[in-house]
Design a protein with these regions (language model features):
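N-terminal auxiliary segments of SAM/dcSAM-dependent transferases
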Residues: 2-79
Length: 79
């Protein structure tokens, strides 16, 4: 099975909200890493099935984050 990995850097305060969004989207869980030298930021990585391409998944996530008024620093994806 092929997976797409998407990493998003956000403020630590919104991690719980992001977890709820990921559960609604189709996430198989997520990994949270605190950004070195910046304890207020966290990198959240999720793994999604590749039945959609990277750009489709990024658009879905970006829309969900905007709808929830969650801003992010960056979003990176890879297969």
């Amino acid at each position: 099975m092929k997976w797409i990995e998407i990493s998003i850097t956000v403020e630590v305060a919104v991690i719980d909200e992001m977890a709820a969004i990921f559960n609604d989207i189709e996430s198989n869980g997520y990994i949270e890493e605190i950004i070195e030298n910046n304890p207020n930021l966290s990198r959240v990585t999720i793994y999604l099935e590749a039945h959609k391409d990277e750009e489709q998944w990024k658009q879905i996530i970006e829309t969900a984050l905007q709808d929830a008024n969650i801003s992010y620093k960056d979003m990176v994806s890879k297969t």
